[in-house]
Amino acid sequence: MQDEWQIAPRLSINGGVRLEWATEPEEKYGRDVALPNLTDRAPTIGRLYENPGVNVSPRGGFAWNVTGDGRTSLRGGYGLYYNTNNQQNLIVTITNPPFTPRPVIASPTFPNPPFNRAGATSIRPMQFDLEYPRVHVWNLSAQRELPWQTVATVSYAGSRGRHLLRSNDVNTALPTSLADGTPFFPAGTPRQNTAFSTIELKSSD
């Protein structure tokens, strides 16, 4: 929904709002796997994440004939835009246990087969309270008509992304500190959640 108003002979504004709804993906046979809390000892079979619901995208702008002669103008605008969840983040969840175990090899020494398994599997969950990525976009520009059919323009455009998607292992071991404050990982330091090896979380912070 969007409209424009001529609120004065030299000033017009426009504004609008867009409502967006993205449905939750579902595996045909109900084999979606989640890890609602990173401290859980086993994955949960069910929804991948909580749907954030309706996204509201406002936008607006203005155009001002500064001098009234049509030779100098000032324009500006702002908009908020959402993205959907990255499909790649959804696809990799099919490799999650218990339906598709992903064992991690602890000591792959070839002269000593079989490999020594670590005793824990890795998992690639979605952040359960996921927020959809969004970007705030704004701009401001001034134009002045010059002789010789020339127009001078000075513009500023900016944007800021929030809740951008990322992927990283959130189940790393916690370091200790040496006497000088240097972080140190002693050999054999366990991961934070010992039920899993890597927890490759697909998150939006």
Regions found by a protein language model. Give the residues of each.
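Surface-exposed extracellular loop regions of Gram-negative outer-membrane beta-barrel proteins
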Residues: 1-22, 27, 54-64, 135
